């Protein structure tokens, strides 16, 4: 089986991690993998390092006929069986490529939780008959896909996943690097510095936490983006420079997590199923997360891995963090539940099996 993974921006976010995981697992085992992209970044570098057959071409918009022709030529010359597209632009271009080469099947993974406009919904209904299967990475995403014009019978919910750590945490160097004492309560979030990640809301919540917490604490924000200066000024204006540290982009995410006590996700929108939360759980970190997208699939009463709060409720966010900082028994139980949940629900090997079952289904096997 020959599978081509199609993505516009080959960057360093969760979707790119999703694609890399699949390629690393399937290539030269169950399948021969190929990769096509438009804008270069970390993922395109990683594919080159792994010697994956790679193609770069411009994808201006979802209706880019020139891109569709290039894609069809790649599929014809390499006898591609399946295009696995990420995001709507890539999905539409994949469908248009079938005008020029009809043999390729199309699988589309939706990584977004956005309600489409009426125009998009109409177009979706025209396009989806030519999409063989749709994967949603969370349950709320599936409901939105149906609302956006995708047929329910074509949609499979397959969560993102990680390789279970079994509760083993590496010795972290982050506290020593930043001069953080062992008795300091370390709260961490790893996110692009983008409005959708709700970091202004998180900073405002920490301002309230600062008034009630009884122990030393620090919030570490790992990530880069266009809001860096704005967030830095906000932190300084609130007098929280000693309590909130902007770390910039880091390649040692697991090292940071292993030196932390809890994780927070403050997203306001666009969150499907967060890899960062899964990685935090894998490092035994109970998590406080906003009730958006697929966060509730991970953090809920059944999993017992932390607390869900409504976006914008700074009191709820501050109080949830405070409770975890003060209740050691609750914190320890949450750590145990994190490992159990990763093993049973978000185990990457299960995700590999379920995704390949989709490929076999579209190939009639």
Predicted regions and their residues:
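Membrane-interface segments of envelope glycosyltransferases acting on lipid-linked substrates or membrane lipids
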Residues: 1-365
């Amino acid at each position: 089986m020959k599978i081509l993974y199609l993505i516009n921006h080959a960057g360093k976010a969760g979707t790119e991690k999703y694609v890399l995981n699949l390629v690393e697992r399937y290539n030269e085992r169950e399948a021969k993998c190929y990769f096509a992209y438009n804008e270069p970044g970390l993922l395109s570098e990683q594919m080159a390092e792994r010697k994956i057959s790679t193609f770069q071409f411009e994808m201006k918009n979802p209706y880019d006929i020139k891109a569709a022709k290039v894609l069809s030529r790649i599929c014809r010359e390499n006898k591609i069986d399946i295009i696995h597209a990420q995001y709507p632009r890539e999905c539409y271009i994949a469908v248009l490529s079938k005008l020029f080469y009809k043999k390729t099947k199309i699988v589309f993974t939706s990584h977004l939780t956005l309600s489409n406009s009426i125009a998009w919904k109409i177009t979706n209904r025209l396009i989806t008959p030519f999409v063989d299967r749709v994967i949603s990475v969370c349950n709320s995403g599936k409901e939105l896909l149906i609302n956006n014009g995708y047929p329910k019978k074509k949609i499979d919910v397959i969560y993102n996943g990680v390789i279970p750590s079994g509760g083993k945490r590496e010795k972290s160097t982050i506290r020593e690097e930043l001069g953080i004492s062992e008795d300091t309560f370390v709260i961490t979030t790893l996110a692009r510095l983008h409005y959708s990640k709700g970091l202004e809301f998180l900073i405002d919540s920490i301002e309230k936490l600062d008034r009630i917490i009884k122990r030393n604490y620090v919030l570490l924000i790992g990530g880069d983006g266009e809001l860096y200066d704005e967030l830095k000024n906000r932190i300084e204006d609130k007098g929280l420079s000693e309590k909130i540290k902007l770390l910039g982009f880091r390649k040692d995410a697991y090292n940071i997590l292993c030196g932390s006590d809890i994780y927070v996700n403050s997203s306001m929108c666009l969150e499907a199923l967060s890899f960062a939360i899964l990685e935090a759980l894998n490092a035994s970190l109970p998590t406080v997360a906003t009730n958006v997208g697929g966060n509730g699939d991970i953090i809920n009463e059944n999993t017992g891995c932390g607390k869900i709060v409504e976006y914008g409720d700074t009191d709820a966010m501050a109080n949830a963090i405070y409770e975890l900082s003060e209740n050691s028994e609750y914190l320890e139980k949450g750590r145990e539940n994190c490992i159990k949940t990763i093993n049973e629900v978000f185990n990457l090997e299960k995700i590999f099996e379920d995704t390949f079952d989709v490929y076999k289904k579209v190939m009639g096997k």
